Structure formats: structure tokens, C-alpha cells
């Protein structure tokens, strides 16, 4: 067992507090895979994962190992998320269905810095509840359910990542273990 700080900050694989699965975050600013100095993965004092330096193309990955996962299975994703004042605002919740990423809920469009984008969530600086149920058209015989939260735009207008943050929050009432949650509902 490794502590959450080491799991996420060093290994990029924060294990679920209950059940199986993990959270990772992928920074994509540098094409060689190296991190920009403003891009970090952190565990806050409450145990909540957050990152600095989010950039268009970055994503949170939520992965749950499965066997004999049948087509037509419904999976519910719930979570609280928020950004700092200089965090990236436009994100898409997507799920891997076969070999394609699909939007987990209705999409919207916006023009950001002259570019038209498609997104599912406009993330505020106060906690936003996400509660989405998606139906997987394709089964998974032996693999993982994959859901990602993908950064769709550079809303800061800068040329490189800044220190703005995005986090998965939770509540003290539940020991900070209630967000995000992924569960099969049908």
C-alpha cells in the first residue's frame, strides 16, 4: 500500500478509497511527455486530488478494471469538481465505448479565443456537481471501463500553462471519500 500522495503525485495512479479503480491525470502540453514547470499533480490537505497547469488536450482518466462487462450496461458517474480563478473552464466528460470516446452527456458549443469548441461542462470556481449515467453499447470481456474529463480549450489566452488548478472535491461529512463515484446501475 502506498499513500495517496505518492500514488497520485509520483505514480499518477490514485487508487479508489473503496472498490477497485483509480484516477490519473495526463498533462499534454509538452509533446515529449515531460511536464511543464507549472504542471503538477497534487494531493491537498483534505486528500483531494488536484492539478496545476491544465491545458487543452489534458485529461483526468478514471479507470475501473472489469471482466464480462455486458453491452447495454449503464454506469453512473458522480463527482464534485471546481477550478481556481485562473483554471481552464471548458471540459468534456467522455467514456470509451469500444475504441471511441463518446460524450457522456449533451454537448454545447462556445467560441474561445476565436476557436469554436464543443464541451459538456463549464466548470466554475465553486463546487459543481456532475451526475451522469451513460450506457455502454459495447461490452468489455477483460479490460477497463474508462471515463475521462477532457480539457477542451485554453481559456486563459496564455501561450503556456499557468498555476491555475482543477480538483475533484468531496465533503467532510463523508470523510472526503465521496467524489468521484463510479457505479454500475443496471
Model-predicted regions and their roles:
Residues 1-2:
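Boundary/junction segments of secreted and surface-exposed precursor proteins
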Residues 60-62, 75-77, 91, 130-132, ...:
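Hydrophobic residues positioned within well-ordered beta-strands of beta-sheet architectures
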Residues 79, 92-100:
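Short beta-strand segments and strand-loop junctions that repeat across beta-rich extracellular domains
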Amino acid at each position: 500500500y502506498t499513500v495517496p500522495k505518492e500514488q497520485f503525485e509520483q505514480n499518477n495512479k490514485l487508487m479508489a478509497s473503496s472498490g477497485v479503480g483509480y484516477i490519473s491525470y495526463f498533462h499534454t502540453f509538452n509533446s515529449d511527455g515531460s511536464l511543464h514547470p507549472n504542471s503538477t499533480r497534487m494531493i491537498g490537505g483534505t486528500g483531494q486530488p488536484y492539478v496545476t497547469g491544465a491545458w487543452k488536450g489534458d485529461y483526468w482518466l478514471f479507470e475501473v478494471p472489469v471482466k464480462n462487462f455486458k453491452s447495454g450496461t449503464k454506469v453512473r458517474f458522480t463527482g464534485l469538481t471546481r477550478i481556481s480563478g485562473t483554471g481552464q473552464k471548458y471540459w468534456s466528460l467522455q467514456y470509451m465505448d469500444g475504441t471511441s470516446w463518446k460524450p457522456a452527456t449533451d454537448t454545447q458549443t462556445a467560441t474561445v479565443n476565436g476557436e469554436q469548441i464543443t464541451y459538456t461542462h463549464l466548470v466554475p470556481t465553486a463546487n459543481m456537481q456532475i451526475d451522469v449515467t451513460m450506457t455502454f453499447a459495447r461490452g468489455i470481456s477483460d479490460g477497463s471501463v474508462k471515463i475521462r474529463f477532457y480539457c477542451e480549450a485554453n481559456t486563459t489566452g496564455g501561450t503556456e500553462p499557468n498555476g491555475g488548478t482543477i480538483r475533484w472535491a468531496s465533503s467532510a461529512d463523508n470523510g472526503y471519500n465521496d467524489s468521484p463515484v463510479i457505479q454500475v446501475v443496471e
